[in-house]
Amino acid sequence: MKLPNSHNLLIASLLGLLTLFAGSYPLVKAQSEPKPGCQATVDKILQEIRSKGVRRVEFSVSKGTANSYRTGNPTTRTDVLDVVLIDDVGATTSNGIAISNIFASPKLLNNWANQIVKNCGNTAIVSFWISQSDISRNYYIQQDGTTIKEKCSQLDNTSEPIPWGLGLPVSCG
């Protein structure tokens, strides 16, 4: 059954108006990509470390320990995230050399620390460690949400608490 001409005209007019108006309104952009979560950020960094030749790397979070023996944290964050590069085959192997190269790049470590504190809402300190050694690089959150590398203090081991961002000569590098 064929619709009368007035109905065809009405439908065609409505379709024309819809087409006209659809083109005149800007499309609403979907919201930007959500910030990657803490776990996704850490996983990405661990994968990047592996891609640089490190065979094994692990991480752990020490909840609520950032202010232990320290004073002056400019934030309310309290967690320490440790990234451990495992050197179980020796410093002269390709794995050991890859670890040494990473630790020789404070800008790279600082970049990773900044990514972690940006996406891990309660992380105040990011520590990079070489397993089976005393070698670590520690990055402390600042008021602006970025991190700075730990500075070596001249304080002795009995000085408690240690000012934020300072480390004892034994542990800082």
Residue ranges and their predicted role:
Residues 50-96, 120-173:
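Polar/charged, Gly/Pro-rich intrinsically disordered segments
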Residues 29-33, 115, 147, 167:
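Disulfide-bonded cysteine motifs in exported proteins
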Residues 2-14:
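Bacterial N-terminal signal peptides that target proteins for export
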Residues 10, 31-38, 98, 102-105:
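Intrinsic-disorder-associated interaction segments
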Residues 97-122:
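Short, non-transmembrane amphipathic alpha-helical segments
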Residues 25-67:
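N-terminal leader/targeting segments
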Residues 12-22:
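Bacterial N-terminal signal peptides
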